[in-house]
Regions:
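A generic local secondary-structure boundary/capping motif
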Residues: 22-25, 93-95, 134-135
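Structural motif
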Residues: 33, 71-72, 104, 143-145
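Short, well-ordered turn and helix-capping elements at secondary-structure junctions
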Residues: 20, 39-41, 78, 150
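Extracytoplasmic/luminal low-complexity segments enriched in Pro/Gly and acidic/polar residues
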Residues: 113-161
Length: 161
């Protein structure tokens, strides 16, 4: 009976820890993928308007999630289900924090799926490198740390009558 109770407590503790990781409340470490996106040359200048108009960061995040990415940050801004990627003037905001190029995307996830993803041709990453004046660099990395969110989402609920 006591052993059963300890197992249930352990199971609940694991679920809580997993939830904290997914929500971005704790740092995560693991293997994954590093992606760097920048203008091909300095003459192009600020690419924020261009990147936002074409929803490039949003499309990359979605494709990464489908291909094994579990935890993602862009320029050290941790993403979770409440994160927003939006244009604000001449820069992009993530989690209401302005970020600038180059866009460094860190991904932790299934290393085999992520490796297969970057080795495939005709991925979205390939297309932005070919179709836009952007330089895309990718690298598989064994030791990646993605820090917890600096601003924890405060959920507010509307009270009913």
């Amino acid at each position: 009976e006591n052993l059963k109770s300890k197992n249930q407590d352990s199971k609940v503790a694991n679920q809580i820890n997993t939830l904290k990781e997914v929500l971005g409340y704790v740092d995560v470490k693991g293997s994954g993928l590093l992606i760097k996106i920048d203008a091909i040359n300095d003459e192009i200048g600020n690419i924020a308007n261009f990147v936002d108009y074409n929803k490039i960061l949003l499309n990359i995040v979605n494709e990464i999630k489908v291909n094994g990415g579990e935890y993602i940050s862009i320029n050290n801004q941790r993403l979770n289900q409440y994160s927003e990627i939006s244009l604000a003037g001449s820069h992009i905001n993530i989690n209401s924090t302005p970020i600038a190029q180059p866009y460094n995307i860190n991904v932790i996830g299934d290393i085999d799926e992520l490796t297969d993803y970057i080795n495939k041709k005709n991925t979205y990453l390939d297309s932005i490198g070919k179709n836009y004046q952007l330089k895309v660099e990718t690298k598989i990395e064994k030791n990646i740390t993605i820090e917890k969110m600096s601003i924890i989402n405060k959920l507010e609920y509307i009270e009913g009558e």
